[in-house]
Amino acid sequence: EERRAKRSPLRDVAGMLRSFDYAALDALRDVATTADEWAALAPLAREWAQQSRGAFLQGYADRAKGTPLAGALEPGRGLLGLFELEKALYELRYELKNRPDWVRIPLQGILGVVG
């Protein structure tokens, strides 16, 4: 029954946007072994995530031209922002339960939407 329920494709877009943040910070965790390395590389990881999010949204917007989704692809705003927040809150709950040392990733996502 749940599979047949209509879902907004913006939920999937929000999930993809969140995955870029995870990929960037997971890669950073793999290479930054000291606080100095973290401080030096964190801005690059954030920039990569932002560039990737932007490229994904641009490609999606190009394909969505002429559809109701075309005007709803501004990250952190409207329905897409709500779905991003929903996904980040779900991630926070998951990480607190299973991987507390990863909590930084969803917290940054939450702050990015509400801040």
Question: Can you describe what each PLM-predicted range is?
Answer:
Residues 1-64, 85-100:
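Active-site activation/catalytic loop segments of kinase-like enzymes and analogous catalytic loops
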Residues 45-48, 78, 103-115:
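Short secondary-structure subsegments characteristic of cysteine-rich extracellular domains
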Residues 69-83:
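All-alpha amphipathic helical-bundle segments outside canonical DNA-binding/catalytic cores
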